[in-house]
Regions:
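Glycine-rich phosphate-binding active-site loops on the catalytic face of alpha/beta enzymes
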Residues: 59-63, 83-97, 145-161, 185-188, ...
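Conserved N-terminal beta1-alpha1 strand-loop-helix module at the mouth
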Residues: 1-84, 137-138, 142-143
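Generic secondary-structure signature for well-ordered alpha-helical cores
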Residues: 26-34, 48-51, 79-82, 86-87, ...
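Alpha-helix-loop-beta-strand connector modules within alpha/beta enzyme cores
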Residues: 40, 44-65, 103-128, 145-146, ...
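Glycine-rich, proline-tolerant flexible connector loops at the mouths of alpha/beta enzymes
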Residues: 25, 29-45, 63-65, 89-107, ...
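Hydrophobic faces of well-ordered beta-strands that scaffold small-molecule active sites
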Residues: 3-10, 34-38, 56-62, 87-91, ...
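General structural feature for long, well-ordered alpha-helical segments within catalytic domains
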Residues: 20, 24, 42, 73-76, ...
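Catalytic cores of alpha/beta
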Residues: 47, 68-83, 131-142, 165, ...
């Protein structure tokens, strides 16, 4: 399978304009990428621009801190699903609750978003750069208990992004629970994306989807994969 289908072409910068989102979606359509990931204010626009394609519309809630009340995350999710017709939701785990040892609260927070998103998939960003390896293992357990479909490494807005080491840990744990892994944060070239997939990533979140596809085409010695 072409690497394009692993990629969620991402633009979550606060200064992103309508023109930027239009360009993102045009690129996703041209390169037949797996999805686009945008803030909720642009989810409806992305759906409109990509109607009739198989590019998934992904949005984020509780982003990037995860510190919103569960009710707020759930409402944002329901609006995105019911009104903007998104395909998937990436939420940020409540890091404060997790670090405080309030694991039931973390699970309840995730479950609230999962319920609001039904029947669509939820990915939970655990911000691996802020966790020890033992905490990453625990976070995967809580993500699964909350009913989410994927665990995701990073927001891209903290002090670090995805690493091979972290993806390997998440993939090992995710396999135990039957959930997927999304690697995101700092993945900007084909070799890095390929290494993340080899480490166990099922999805790649990146702002460099075009460059990665073009790198793959060069590596394969042919035209762009479709």
């Amino acid at each position: 399978m072409s690497i394009a289908k692993y990629l969620e072409h991402t633009l979550l910068k606060p200064e992103a304009t309508v023109a930027d989102i239009m360009k993102l979606c045009a690129e996703a359509k041209e390169y037949n990428l797996g999805g686009v990931c945008v803030n909720t204010c642009y989810a409806g626009l992305a759906r409109h621009l990509l109607v009739g394609t198989d590019v998934k519309i992904v949005t984020v809630v509780g982003f990037p801190l995860g510190a919103d009340r569960s009710e707020v995350k759930a409402l944002a999710t329901k609006l995105a699903v019911d009104e903007d017709h998104v395909d998937e939701v990436d939420m940020v785990m409540n890091m404060s609750a997790f670090k405080s040892g309030n694991y039931d609260g973390v699970v309840e927070d995730i479950a609230a978003v999962v319920e609001a998103a039904k029947p669509y998939a939820v990915k939970v960003i655990i911000e691996t750069c802020l966790l020890t390896d033992e905490e990453k293992v625990k976070a995967c357990e809580l993500v699964a208990k909350g009913g989410a479909a994927f665990v995701k490494t990073s927001t891209g807005f903290s002090k670090g992004g995805a690493t091979i080491h972290d993806v390997e840990i998440l993939a090992r744990e995710a396999n135990r629970y039957g959930i997927g892994v999304k690697a995101a944060g700092g993945i900007r070239d084909y070799e890095t994306a390929k290494a993340m997939i080899a480490a166990g990533a099922d999805r790649i979140g990146t702002s460099a989807g075009v460059a990665i596809c073009e790198d793959e085409a060069k590596a394969m010695g042919g035209g762009l994969p479709k």
